[in-house]
Regions:
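Nucleotide-sugar donor-binding catalytic core of glycosyltransferases
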Residues: 1-149
Length: 149
């Protein structure tokens, strides 16, 4: 069965044919990127989703923002919510190679953890270096600070 989808308002360098949602839907559907989609996925990096028509709009955020259910039919977010239109999908979930996506020139997926490596006992490894920077929303000095790190 064919399913037409599209993505708008995602981060720079987002690849519509190489992401969690595309690969997930491709396991059950013949997925096609289309300007008149059945499902429009949108994030919070722009506001062009408001001008797009689609049978269904699905909001995704990895930011500390709650979905506006007046604008979307369904949402994937970090939020614990009792709303049946919201599915909790923390950002870390997208960093696992659930679909065994091969390495490609367009996107280096070598940093992803293959699903098979998550099964069985964990092997301890000595960590050499670690850096963590957590922030919510891209305002103020946060983005320039992140770029300096």
């Amino acid at each position: 069965m064919k399913l037409k989808i599209n993505f708008v308002d995602f981060w720079p360098n987002f690849i519509p044919t190489d992401n969690y949602f595309y690969h997930l839907l491709s396991t059950k559907y013949d997925v096609e990127i289309d300007e008149s989609p059945d499902i429009l996925f949108y994030a919070d990096f722009e506001n062009s989703n408001l001008s797009h028509e689609a049978q269904r709009k699905v909001y995704y955020t990895g930011e500390n923002k709650r979905p506006n259910f007046d604008e979307c039919d369904f949402a994937f977010s970090f939020d614990y919510s009792d709303n049946p239109k919201n599915y909790r999908l923390p950002l870390w979930v997208l960093w696992i190679n659930w679909f065994d996506v091969p390495h490609s020139e367009e996107r280096d997926v070598s940093y992803l953890t293959p699903l098979n490596n998550l099964i069985g006992p964990r092997k301890a490894s000595k960590k050499q270096k670690f850096c963590n920077f957590v922030f919510s929303n891209h305002t103020g000095i946060r983005v320039p600070l992140l770029n300096e790190i």
